[in-house]
């Protein structure tokens, strides 16, 4: 499981594991969580039954038995939620907290998730996965302790941020307030007030020009590229093309249109080993320079890098599965794409979206060994969901054809 000497790699898990009232329940859940695999049915529920029999045979209390069984059934829940859901959405946190119910279960589940991810493939445990799980844990804990703590309206988020900003010069605060007038509510819905304060450092210097900044939140998380530029066709595809050509991993994107004809995009990045790209490193400086040069052009022509698939990946054959649903609350279409990982995958996906006039509003990227599971929130050029069935079917068909090509 988790060793004390691993404090540097698993700081939160190392802290929590010492607070578990009965660590043996974590051990039993760890032993039985995958025992049902390969037996022709839902492995989690089968594992629950087998673990329950073990607990009964060894005279566990009913409460301890329920805890073990709950952990076995839900052992994938935290990993899936953190990887695939929008953790800035209060409803996501609320739903997860209602499933977990107690702080004790949350602590057990976090420790089991960390152990499971690391034991399955040590390379899957990186700064990005660690930060996602930590964020989900922290927000869920806040919800369990105070159900109103994470649900701030855009207006409340702005007010909290302004309170912190008051320590800055009044000229800076005034500039930030003026800049905020150009944002729609989605910007304030997607970030907490601490993030708004962090962004304000850069927003206070905004002019009518392209701005690219590498933001380091803290030493435990990955870097984010903040990009302010004219909002026009091909902005995101241009960014992805440059990231791909620089061999930089793209993990998450939040894209915001502004009332003044500009856009503000946030892209979470890492190097090829999954580690942070430091703000003043040579690769970061090269990235910033190339992005500014490309985005300063009046007409954007994204360069899609075509690279051969590594030989070792050709031995894995993952069928492409594309699923979608319309989200009328956010006025976009969510598209989940599961396919084989390969060089240039994101650029290929972006090209299909580009060819069909689809605008990407959000993206979440997840890679599991040779398999990629990516989520994109897209709209039509009219900023509406892709509701026309024939257009959506053509997009999906072309995406399938593109991703099925042998490289």
Model-inferred region functions:
Residues 42-66, 267, 376:
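Divalent-cation-assisted or electrostatically stabilized phosphate/pyrophosphate-binding catalytic cores
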Residues 29-32, 36, 48-56, 69, ...:
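Short, well-ordered alpha-helical packing segments
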Residues 6, 55, 62-65, 80, ...:
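Conserved catalytic alpha/beta cores of large enzymes that bind or transform nucleotide phosphates
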Residues 91, 95-407:
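Regulatory modules associated with amino-acid/nitrogen control
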Residues 8-14, 61-70, 259-260:
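Short, glycine/acidic-rich hinge or "gate" loops at secondary-structure transitions
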Residues 7-19, 32, 52-53, 90-97, ...:
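Flexible, glycine/threonine-enriched loop-and-boundary segments that flank and lead into catalytic domains
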Residues 56-114:
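Acidic/histidine-rich catalytic neighborhood
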Residues 1-44, 49, 59:
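Acidic/His-rich, divalent-metal-binding segments that scaffold phosphate/diphosphate chemistry
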């Amino acid at each position: 499981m988790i060793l004390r000497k691993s404090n540097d790699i698993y700081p939160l898990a190392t802290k929590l594991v010492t607070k578990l009232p009965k660590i043996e329940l974590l051990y039993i859940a760890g032993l039985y969580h995958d025992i049902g695999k390969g037996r022709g049915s839902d492995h989690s529920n089968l594992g629950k039954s087998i673990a329950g029999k073990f607990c009964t045979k060894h005279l566990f209390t009913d409460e301890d038995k329920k805890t073990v069984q709950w952990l076995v059934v839900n052992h994938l829940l935290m990993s899936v939620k953190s990887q695939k859901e929008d953790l800035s959405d209060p409803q996501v946190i609320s739903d997860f907290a209602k499933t977990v119910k107690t702080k004790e279960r949350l602590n057990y589940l976090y420790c089991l998730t960390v152990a499971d991810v690391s034991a399955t493939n040590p390379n899957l445990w990186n700064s990005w996965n660690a930060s996602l799980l930590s964020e989900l844990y922290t927000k869920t804990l806040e919800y369990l302790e105070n159900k109103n703590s994470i649900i701030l309206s855009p207006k409340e988020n702005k007010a909290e941020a302004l309170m912190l900003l008051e320590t800055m010069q009044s000229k800076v605060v005034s500039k930030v307030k003026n800049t905020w007038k150009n944002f729609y509510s989605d910007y304030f819905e997607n970030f907490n007030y601490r993030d708004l304060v962090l962004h304000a450092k850069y927003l206070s210097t905004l002019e009518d020009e392209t701005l690219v900044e590498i933001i380091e939140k803290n030493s435990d998380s990955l870097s984010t590229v903040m990009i302010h530029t004219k909002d026009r066709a091909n902005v995101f595809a241009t960014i992805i093309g440059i990231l791909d050509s620089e061999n930089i991993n793209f993990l998450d994107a939040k894209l915001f249109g502004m009332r003044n004809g500009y856009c503000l995009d946030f892209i979470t990045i890492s190097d090829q080993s999954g580690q942070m790209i430091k703000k003043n490193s040579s690769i970061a400086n090269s990235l910033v320079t190339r992005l500014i040069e490309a985005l300063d052009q009046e007409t954007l022509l994204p360069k899609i890098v075509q690279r051969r698939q590594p030989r070792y990946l050709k031995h894995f054959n993952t069928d492409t599965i594309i699923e979608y649903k319309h989200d009328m609350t956010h006025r976009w279409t969510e598209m989940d794409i599961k396919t084989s990982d390969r060089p240039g995958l994101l650029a290929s996906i972006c090209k299909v979206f580009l060819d069909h006039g689809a605008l990407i509003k959000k993206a979440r990227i997840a890679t599991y060994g040779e398999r990629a599971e990516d989520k994109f929130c897209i709209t039509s050029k009219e900023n509406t969901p892709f509701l026309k069935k024939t257009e959506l079917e053509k997009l999906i068909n072309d995406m399938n054809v593109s991703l099925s090509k042998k490289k």
